Amino acid sequence: MSEDPQSWSKERKNCERVKRALMSQSPVIIFLKTALDRLNCNIEAKDISCQPCDAQSTGGYIPGKGIVLCENRLYTKKMAENTIAHEMIHMFDDHRFEVDWNNLRHQACSEIRASSMSGECRWTKELRFGNIKTFRKHHQECVKRRATISVQGNPNCKSKEQAEAIVEEVFNSCFNDFRPFEKIY
């Protein structure tokens, strides 16, 4: 797509505007940016690319390249914030722990952490989308569900059952690792 802002789609213009606002105004994004800076991994708005996507994804982290926001899948500013936070947690993990993204356990751990800490499993969001089946330990169930879906997308994953087993295997240690946060609410 052309880099001339005049030729950008309405979705691209909105994505660019929202991403720039979040990078300078969102407390969680600013906190994660600072944590990444401490790892000598500087990220600016220009390192987050707005692109149209075909899949059901709202974004992605590409090791060594940066973050992609799916301009045609972001419907609210909060959704964009959750997506950027999720991908920044992957970036943090990649730089802090040298994640091997082909290793399903490594990916599952990062997905668990990102789903738990990004806000995408907030109770209010889950309620709005009809995903609340029980109030007890719902956050954990949401994190497991979302991590399983992501691991299933890895070409090295053979089945949903394998993804579920791997997520379950690493869940406790990864779910209880809040770095760079002290805790989650």
Curated annotation (Swiss-Prot):
It comes from Schizosaccharomyces pombe (strain 972 / ATCC 24843) (Fission yeast). The gene is atp23. It is found in: Mitochondrion inner membrane. Belongs to the peptidase M76 family. It is a peripheral membrane protein. One of its GO terms (cellular component) is mitochondrial inner membrane. Keywords: Hydrolase, Membrane, Metal-binding, Metalloprotease, Mitochondrion, Mitochondrion inner membrane, Protease. A divalent metal cation binds at residues 86, 90. Its EC number is 3.4.24.-. This is Mitochondrial inner membrane protease atp23. The active site is at 87. It holds the Pfam family Peptidase_M76. It is an enzyme of class 3 (hydrolase). One of its GO terms (biological process) is mitochondrial protein processing. Has a dual role in the assembly of mitochondrial ATPase. Acts as a protease that removes N-terminal residues of mitochondrial ATPase CF(0) subunit 6 at the intermembrane space side. Also involved in the correct assembly of the membrane-embedded ATPase CF(0) particle, probably mediating association of subunit 6 with the subunit 9 ring. GO terms for molecular function: metal ion binding; metalloendopeptidase activity. The keyword 4Fe-4S does not apply.
